[in-house]
A protein has these predicted regions:
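Short amphipathic alpha-helical interface segments
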Residues: 10-22
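A short alpha-helical element within helix-turn-helix/winged-helix DNA-binding domains
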Residues: 26-35
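Key DNA-contact positions within bacterial/archaeal DNA-binding proteins
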Residues: 40
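Basic amphipathic alpha-helical segments that dock to polyanions
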Residues: 45-50
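Beta-hairpin "wing" of winged helix-turn-helix
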Residues: 54-67
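C-terminal regulatory/oligomerization modules of transcriptional regulators
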Residues: 76, 94-145
């Protein structure tokens, strides 16, 4: 499994919104500038996040985006599942309507299922709040006189 650029950028966008949650609605151009991501690329990610009601949006002069919930209520796993379509390490574990024809006899299937559980448990155990705290700690450690 390889996390796509879309997934990584969505996570950076959500973390940026968490960082600036006290600023009200945040313009996409500001997120793009701070994160050094193309605004056009972020415009492709926003509909995916918006449809899932994890963002609040408003239009107009003071328009922009903000988190719909508190940062501790979002997991990295949730965000990546929305943008990646799943976290399965192999195609046969993806949520396809047609199961793998070798499913009943595959000796490696239990291993892949175990890996998927480990990945999901790990990513579901990290919240945006956790990432915010790590970011703050890193910034404090980077302080130079």
């Amino acid at each position: 499994m390889k996390i796509s650029t879309k997934g990584r950028y969505a996570l950076r966008m959500m973390l940026d919104l968490a960082t600036h949650q006290g600023d009200g609605y945040v313009a996409l151009k500001d997120i793009a500038q701070r994160q050094e991501i193309s605004k056009k690329y972020l415009e492709q990610i926003v509909p995916t996040l918006g449809k899932s009601n994890i963002l609040r949006t408003t239009r107009g002069y003071q328009g922009g985006y903000r988190l719909a919930r508190a940062p501790q209520d979002y997991t990295v796993g949730e965000i990546l599942r929305l943008t990646e379509g799943g976290l399965a390490p192999v195609a046969c574990l993806d949520q396809h309507p047609i199961p793998c024809p070798r499913c009943g006899e595959c000796a490696t299937l239990p291993m892949w299922e175990g890996l998927e559980r480990v990945i999901c448990n790990y990513l579901d155990g990290i919240t945006l709040q956790d990432l915010l705290e790590q970011q703050t700690a890193r910034a404090a450690n980077d302080y130079v006189i």
